[in-house]
A protein has these predicted regions:
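Conserved NTP phosphate-binding and transfer environment spanning the P-loop NTPase/kinase superfamily
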Residues: 1-134
Length: 134
């Protein structure tokens, strides 16, 4: 059962003295015209570098409803021309309406999984929901 699977990993993570930090990235986010918003594969290293620096306490971040994310000036844009601050801001914008729909789908899925959904996942879902419905 998926709930047991999640419980296993949450239990394992709780046993670690220094659990790894978890980052999420959507390299494939598209604009209204269906074009990819992130400039491309070669630029992924800019975000990966920020992640490593963030883990080492050397990088800044800004708070969002989803957690911490880099601002435009937090990434190393050396050697990169043509990716404007405005493009980055659009790319990293948190779409509340889309996330409300996504969280509703999560709630449906948790309902299907039943009582075996770990409380920690339900609590996290509640925190995210609160961030978008406050």
């Amino acid at each position: 059962h998926m709930g047991d699977y999640f419980s296993h990993w949450l239990k394992l993570g709780a046993q670690l003295a220094q659990p790894p930090r978890i980052f999420t990235v959507n390299w494939f986010r598209q604009d209204a015209d269906g074009q990819f918003m992130w400039p491309g594969f070669g630029d992924n290293m800019r975000v990966l570098k920020w992640m490593v620096e963030r883990c080492g306490g050397q990088a800044q971040a800004r708070r969002s409803a989803l957690g911490w994310m880099p601002g435009y000036d937090d990434l190393d844009w050396s050697g990169r021309e043509g990716f404007a601050r405005s493009q980055f801001e659009q790319l990293t914008e948190v779409d509340s309406a889309a996330w409300k729909k996504e969280l509703a789908l999560h709630a449906e899925w948790f309902t299907k999984l039943g009582s075996q959904v770990p409380a920690a996942l339900l609590q996290k879902h509640e925190l995210f929901s609160f961030a978008f419905w406050q």
